[in-house]
Amino acid sequence: MEWVLQRSYFKTGTLGALFVNGKFRCFTIELPWRENRRNVSCIPEGRYEVKPRISNKFGNHLILVDVPQRSLILLHPANDALGELQGCIAPVSELSGIARGLHSRRALERLLVIHRDAVERQEAVYLTVTYNAHEYLRTLSKTHPAVFPHPAGGGD
């Protein structure tokens, strides 16, 4: 099963849209790109296997396998990337600002069901992380510049 995370980078965070087999499933929030430095940067673009994981802190969640120069990169609930993430990815149902979202647990639960169904069919799940300046982000940066500044690296 193929999941694709299409990201837009901003100075203070990274926003994404996650698609499963081509269908939009949720938004994501992450830390800004800071040269893949541990605990302060989102992960590099690439293709990663997604596996289930359980911990006392997050309960059921997902982990990305073999992220270069990183370990324990999780998909777990968080609504404020700068305050709650250390390089992981948080699925959210709605975006509320750069690196901020709403209803993260709900979004994660949907992904867990999709992942579990794939595992039951003995399908491996892969996440491809890529750059894509989405039209919705360009539009939001024009209509709400205080909340959604232009993506890092330029305007349109």
What is each residue range found by the language model?
Residues 1-126, 130-153:
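Cell wall/extracellular polymer interaction/catalysis modules
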